[in-house]
Amino acid sequence: MKKYFYFLSLLLLVVSCTSEDVTSNNKAFQALKDNVFWRAEFFQAGTETNGIFTVEGSLDYDQIRFQIPEPAEKTYVLGVDDDTKAVYKNTYKGKEAEFSTGTGKGNGEIMITEYNAIDNTISGTFKFTAVNADSDAEKQTIHFSEGVFYKIPVTPEHNFITTNN
């Protein structure tokens, strides 16, 4: 009888365990920021007035912004040119900082896994190391890994205002 009880307990334990999968959630933008979990509260995607496509996520004073030529389903390599780049900003007063990738600085990739023009959403993964714009700052690089953005709303027929990045 004990064997049956143990078997049923083990079976119940195995059946009740589930893995977390970001695709089971609605809309998400998250990553490990220097190995600490970071999840955006606000996110959006769309085309700026200069024609560049952007994906953005923000949490309080932190903002991540990706710039890609188009929302095509492919992998964009960072650190090669200024057309494709990742920017991280902290806008907290007194602790302002900006890190970015670009021609010959930083590295990483943005992989667009789905661009749904019918539902106006974009999904993908990312990882990057960005360089501080202030060469005299104590912290010179910031690292994002295991990044995912899922079903981020794409604003159709509305251009974002171009910012200086």
Model-derived regions: residue spans:
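Surface-exposed helix/loop patches within compact recognition domains
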Residues: 29, 33, 37-41, 45-121, ...
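Bacterial signal peptide processing site
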Residues: 18-21
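Sec-dependent signal peptide recognition
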Residues: 2-7
